Amino acid sequence: NDTYGIFWKLYDAIPDEELQLIDLTIRMFCDPVLTIDLPRVQSELEKEVGGKVAALLKSGTSAEDLLSNNKFAALLNAAGCPAPMKISPATGKPAYAFAKSDEAFQYLLTHKSEKVRALAEARLKIKSTIGETRAVRFLEAGKNGNKLPILLHYSGAHTHRWSGGNKMNLQNLVRGGELRKSIMAPKGHVVVVADSAQIEA
């Protein structure tokens, strides 16, 4: 096919070291060796879900209201805190400063009103789904004793580093997190973590 033909056109220009990396990358997915500590992942999933439920109960509102910008703004106003605003860099018009990186939103997390703090904390919990979805994907990947397939795209980024695949990028698991700790090496081997945070600096 065309892809196969292109490969052989490029073959002589690809260093042997890169061919070995391509081979290793493919083998990590097609011939996996790592396993998953399923009880540990299940415990982490329950912790994630439980944290959201607790935050919702403390806020005294619903997930639907927290996820809606207009309804969340109304909740803040009702609690005596005007909804923080910013100028949107995309439109140049006023918009709610509800992104977790917005300084004004960060202020809500330390607000003097316990109600306002509870609302802000609950919104953060409800909007953050990565921990929960990753735990579910780990459980799916490791069920029935299956090995953990690691799908990375060789030279997937414009800087030629690997990019994540399979909706489960194992390159950016939370440091010290339970999901990272749930990955187990075969007997006689260990999992070694390498920090690539400055690889493109």
Placement of each model-derived feature along the sequence:
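Conserved "right-hand" nucleotidyltransferase catalytic core of DNA-directed polymerases
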Residues: N1-E178, M184-V190, S196-A201
